[in-house]
UniProtKB/Swiss-Prot annotation:
This is 3-oxo-5-alpha-steroid 4-dehydrogenase. It comes from the Bacteria. It holds the Pfam family FAD_binding_2. FAD binds at residues 33-62. Its cofactor is FAD. It comes from Comamonas testosteroni. Inhibition occurs with substrate concentrations above 25 uM. Belongs to the FAD-dependent oxidoreductase 2 family.
């Protein structure tokens, strides 16, 4: 008997495009003006908008709907709060555009950024029309995600001095709008869009996957899609649905259940998928809204070897469908790693250093920026060093500050179970195998700005500066390998699109007729770290 273990994968196979002379050559099983591939937030929005324009819409979804939107925090980035929506928006729009221009670093045009900023208030109002609810209550501290009852916050680097824009706004408004909900808001966010999709009369086909596109050979127009559909009423179809619900609840099954169980689930899902039947559907235009490639183990091994894969279903099938008809992919090696060290809100008062003991990043920046600096420039290894005063304040916030359990519990464990304690800088340097002189220099360079003598060399704002006055120090391992501190990742690369109309473009820069991209399949540009 062979001891070789067979790899079981649920990655969607995407076939070569089916080229035909005309639509009449295909025996279509269904037809619609618009077929949307993927029923997450972007797919739902595309379907609703198409219905409002009078088009017949068919939404095809591999699972039951929701995609990454359900697993998200349900946060919408927009340049307005309720109090400013009725005021002239030019000053706020210009400030938002300037900030985003700094963040995205040229990945999209200035015109697109300006349009996004200008339309963000309209987009927020549109979401409210679909049933989503927003509010303006804010937490009193910097956080990666606000607690229940708090629905507006600084969700990026807006308050970091290096990202500010004093010529336009002395203090930018918060732009992270969390959908009002109990618990993480992603489910409520998608529930509103799902309900609106159905209310608008869009048809849906769930537990079905698009395996290839159909193209008119001479014109290059995408005519339709070939879909694998699980048979209705089959026990395997019901099992597939239940297993997908299990995966959705756990967000990333390999982190929540034993590996043996995870493998069994993947095998069961693969067996269910093999019972599907193939049917072609004719379309007038086809928006791809299938989710990202962070779950595609082959793609991750190629572009980011050593990184773990993400949520189930994020296999890049929408991207590969676009590539099958000549769509161009860009920045597939651009993976955003989120190392949030707030809350506790006082942690950024500490020092983040590399394994040589050198400070390399402003500790108060957005988690994606810190994660980028750590992963791309420091080999995924870093330490957060705090003193007794910061640790005491952080512990109080974890216990009594109303934080989420996923924020407070890891922080407490890291401070009191994982952290390495040093009686002095020299003692800590010895335990961390660092040069004591190098580490001491970091504290000297941090203490002088804290006393107001000089500016912080990495641009930390005055309220986040902290003078270390001696006593015990605690080094917290915030590396990617730290099992008590999971590192979330998101793929940012994707299909290149015409920024004016969303059409997927080919290698020559021309629109591919009939094919559009929305959501994650097109190149993601928020945020783009520098």
């Amino acid at each position: 008997m062979s001891n070789v273990k067979k790899h079981v994968s649920t990655i969607n196979p995407v076939g070569e495009v089916l080229d035909v002379g005309s639509a009449d050559e295909v025996q279509w099983s269904d037809a619609s003006d618009v077929v949307v591939v993927g029923w997450g937030g972007a797919g739902a929005s595309a379907a609703i908008e198409a219905r409002e324009q009078g088009a017949e819409v068919l939404v095809i979804e591999r699972f039951s709907g929701g995609g990454a939107s359900v697993l998200s925090g349900g946060v919408v980035y927009a340049g307005a709060v309720p109090a400013t929506r009725r005021k002239p928006a030019s000053r706020f729009t210009e400030a938002m555009t300037a900030y985003l221009k700094h963040e995205v670093n040229g990945v999209v045009s200035d015109e697109t950024l300006a349009r996004f900023s200008r339309d963000s208030v309209t987009n927020l109002n549109w979401l409210e029309k679909q049933g989503a609810t927003f509010a303006s209550t804010m937490p009193g501290y910097k956080t990666s995600y606000p607690a229940d009852g708090m629905y507006l916050y600084y969700s990026g680097n807006e308050v970091v001095p290096a990202y500010g824009n004093p010529q336009l706004l002395k203090k930018p408004p918060p732009r992270g709008h969390r959908v009002v909900a109990k618990g993480q808001s992603g489910a409520m966010f998608f529930a509103a869009l799902q309900k609106s999709t159905l209310a608008h009369g869009a048809r849906t086909l769930t537990q079905a996957r698009v395996q290839r596109l159909v193209r008119e050979k001479d014109s290059g127009r995408v005519l339709g899609v070939e879909v694998m559909v699980l048979p209705e009423g089959d026990p395997r179809t019901e099992r597939h649905k239940k297993l997908d619900e299990l995966v959705a609840k756990s967000a990333c099954i390999r982190r929540r259940v034993p590996r043996r169980v995870a493998v069994n689930v993947r095998r069961s899902r693969a067996r269910s998928a093999r019972s599907a039947t193939s049917v072609p559907a004719k379309v007038w235009c086809c928006p791809l809204a299938a989710i990202s490639s962070i779950r595609n183990c082959w793609s991750m091994r190629r572009y980011k070897p050593g990184w773990l894969t993400g949520a189930a279903g994020c296999d890049g099938s929408g991207l590969r469908l676009g590539q099958s008809v000549g769509g161009i992919a860009q920045d597939l090696n651009n993976i955003s790693a989120w190392r949030f060290i707030t809350p506790p809100s006082v942690w950024p008062k500490g020092l983040v250093v590399n394994i040589q003991g050198e400070r390399f990043c402003n500790e108060q920046v957005y988690g994606a920026k810190l994660g980028y600096e750590m992963m791309e420039k420091q080999g995924g290894q870093a330490w957060l060093i705090i003193d007794s005063n910061v640790r005491r304040q952080a512990a109080w916030q974890c216990l009594f500050g109303g934080l989420w359990a996923f924020q407070s519990m890891p922080a407490l464990a890291l401070m009191y179970k994982v952290a390495i304690k040093g009686k002095s800088v020299d003692d800590l340097a010895k335990k961390l195998r660092m040069d004591a002189a190098v580490l001491q220099l970091q504290f000297d360079r941090a203490n002088a700005p804290a006393r107001g003598e000089i500016e912080d060399p990495l641009g930390k704002s005055q309220d986040m500066r902290h003078e270390f006055k001696g006593g015990s120090l605690f080094a917290i391992d915030i590396s990617i390998s730290q099992k008590m501190f999971p590192l979330a990742v998101l793929s940012l690369g994707g299909l290149k699109v015409n920024e004016d109309n969303g059409a997927v473009i080919d290698g020559a820069g021309y629109d591919i007729p009939g094919l559009y991209a929305a959501g994650v399949p097109p190149l993601v540009w928020l945020p783009r770290v520098t």
